[in-house]
Amino acid sequence: MSTKSRTRSKTRLSRALGIPLTPKAAKYLEKRPYAPGEHGRSKRKQDSDYAVRLREKQRLRAQYGIREAQLKIAFQEARRTQGLTGENLVEILEQRLDALVVRSGLARTTAQARQLVVHRHIMVDGKIVDRPSFRVKAGQMIHVKPRSEGTEPFQVAAAGGHADVLPKLPPYLEVELDKLQARLVRLPKRAEVPVTCEVQLVVEYYAAR
């Protein structure tokens, strides 16, 4: 799929879910804040409970850019963990390496963060990690491989080039962009995680299956 096709696909999905998944989609939603398609402007019929839960699950999945199987595994772990399942789920997903790379400003989008990880540009505590799903522990340091620091994507990041499109830095991260590094100082809490999702509806979706 070409870059243009991927951008168009993300924009269409953003409109369907009502959330911006990329900076370009955010600008597009400002102009066309309705679902895609012939009847996008018209008032939708009231969705069924199932449709509402399904859309919320799709919202969460799309914001982390993960497959259904990955979300289901995370949900099962969240259900086994003490506390509220929905909050646990978001907190588990937020510890993904690709999520923290974009959250810290080292990448502009989740897709770019995943690419940087897969191409072995990202290290955790001095070791290269090429799995976007890697679970970062509290206290661990995420940083760019020294040989990659001079490349254009990271020079843009070091200059704060993504600040205009990313949410405010959450309190569970300490970031030194000039050094291209970020530390997960403690585990995230749901209320601090900048994702748009009614997590209880996601719990209800899986509970009904």
UniProtKB/Swiss-Prot annotation:
InterPro entries: Ribosomal_uS4, Ribosomal_uS4_bac-type, Ribosomal_uS4_CS, Ribosomal_uS4_N, S4_RNA-bd, S4_RNA-bd_sf. CDD domains: S4. GO terms for cellular component: small ribosomal subunit. GO terms for biological process: ribosomal small subunit biogenesis; translation. The keyword Ribonucleoprotein applies. SUPFAM superfamilies: Alpha-L RNA-binding motif. SMART domains: Ribosomal_S4, S4. Residues 1-20, 28-49 are annotated as: Disordered. Residues 1-13 have a biased composition (Basic residues). GO terms for molecular function: rRNA binding; structural constituent of ribosome. Residues 95-160 form the S4 RNA-binding domain. Gene3D superfamilies: Ribosomal Protein S4 Delta 41, Chain A, domain 1 (1.10.1050.10), RNA-binding S4 domain (3.10.290.10). The keyword rRNA-binding applies. Keywords: Ribonucleoprotein, Ribosomal protein, RNA-binding, rRNA-binding. It comes from the Bacteria. Belongs to the universal ribosomal protein uS4 family. Part of the 30S ribosomal subunit. Contacts protein S5. The interaction surface between S4 and S5 is involved in control of translational fidelity. PANTHER family: 30S 40S RIBOSOMAL PROTEIN, SMALL RIBOSOMAL SUBUNIT PROTEIN US4M. This is Small ribosomal subunit protein uS4. The lineage of its organism: Bacteria, Bacillati, Actinomycetota, Actinomycetes, Micrococcales.
